[in-house]
Amino acid sequence: PPPPPPPPPPPPPPPRAPPPPPPPPPPPPRARIADLRQQARRRLPRLLLDNAERGTPEGPGWRANRRALAGLVLKPGPAGAPTGARTGAPTGATPDPATRLLGEEAAMPVAIAPTALAGLFHPRGEILGARAAQRVGIPFCLSALSVQPVEQVAAAVPRPLWFQLPLLRDREAMRALLARASAAGCATLVVTLSARLPVPLPRRFGQGGGLPLGLSLSQALDILAHPGWALGLLRAEHRSLGNLRGLVPEGDGLASLLPWLQAQCLTAPDWQAVAWLRGLWPGRLVLKGVLRPAEAHAALDCGAEGVIVSNHGSDAGAEPLPSLQALPEVARLLRGRCAVLADGGIRSGGDVLKALSLGACGVLVGRAWLYGLAADGEAGVERALRILHAELCAAMRRGGISGMSGGGQET
């Protein structure tokens, strides 16, 4: 008989189920200004960052401002919106924080605050900050105590700069600085009514263009541990105060300029000097350091178009009045007569909205842009400003605010 047929092959095993897709990666943590601060601390010698933060721990004015911001809770919904802000945004709509500051269009009610010696945080620091502000669409205020001279910074951006000038005892020096700012096309003059320089800098920065001399061993080792920063400073075109070159007979190095400035800067308002500056300056005049009603009235009498409520320059030995605590009364007194801005401790878009809710038409940020500058140059400054813009939009969305145009005390 024929052999039996072979047994049928076993059925194929059932197809294996495809492996489950890997879980999506966790979303990146939300960027904050505090993250840029940590990056800046890794890149900068502690000496430099501590001077920017007015010592360690951070100075009493900063602490007072931060406490005031932390203690302010916005009312939910449109009840907490700034005066004049547009409310009733549709669900999911993107708010528009664009506004006008001192007659200029601004993508948000924020300007970069004047910061002395920003060019020590990154080569060409003021130019990089001005370019980032230009791209984001907000004003940039250049300090008279900048490393890059006003002519170079103004030439780097098409938008006119704001120029900040401390009140000096030497009026001819102020006249010379005003002439340079006007020739460079600056449209707004910000006069700081009282100024106080960081005390350690004159002791720790020597001659030869501002390189640190006379440091302790730990400070010298700290600088050596940050070679990228040190090499950038050595290669920089400017390492002193570019706007003060030629003003001081003793020389143009920081070792000569900073002691001269400490003797020159007024620590209390001189309203006669302010009126004299008003007569010289053809553009807009803004007074920085207004905290009290009498100062607000004096600002109007001097013909100022704007004030900045700020405790900058407060006595480091006393607890200063927080800017946001002084803001509501100043805003009420000047409503419709003068633009009111504020600064002090602004670290988030929520902080911006809090200041607006108290009557400001805008705020100035100082340390926030310095952290970005130290962390990643021009891109870091832009990142800091984009963070503030995104956080402000989120805060507006939570409050049902659709836009800022016409809000605050802008005139």
PLM feature spans:
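An N-cap/entry alpha-helix motif that binds or orients negatively charged groups
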Residues: P25-G103, G209-P269, G406-G407
